[in-house]
Amino acid sequence: KPLDCSIYYDFCQNFFKQKGGNLSKDVFEQIYHQFNGHTWYIQCIMNRLYETELTIYCIEQVNVALLSILQGREPQFENMVQFFTENQFALLKAIAKDDIVTQPTSGKFIKEHKLSGASSVKAALKVLEDKELVYRTNEGYIIYDRFMDLWLKRI
């Protein structure tokens, strides 16, 4: 269960206050909700912002920090995807594009993303799940690594 947003905000805000800065509650809440309260991703972004900014007042600052994080991880992601089949990589990008996919083997999803047939998607999905790159939630399939998800959306 994620930390309560207001408690987490107070914790992060305290660090910015200690160095004479400020963290906008609205901006923090956007980060919190974008990453579903997942501490690791939020902390990574907060650390980057703390290193580079005194006051956080707009989402554009967060976007710059996120871009920097993604660029730093790009070699890792590029190295990883070279081991995927074309079908696996296409499915990863399709799931990232849709954020969450309830029926990855549906004709609509396959056609919309120009994927191979349902059996190919099913086989690719199994491999991606086994490698813990795709995760099935109660709502549907998502890219497990939220930073990889953002990177896939950009390519």
Identify the function of each model-found stretch.
Residues 26-29, 71-155:
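C-terminal leucine-rich, beta-strand-based interaction scaffolds used for sensing/assembly
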Residues 1-2:
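A short helix-turn-beta junction within AAA+ P-loop NTPase domains corresponding to the substrate/partner-engaging
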Residues 5-76, 138:
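Amphipathic alpha-helical "lid/sensor" segments that cap RecA-like P-loop NTPase cores
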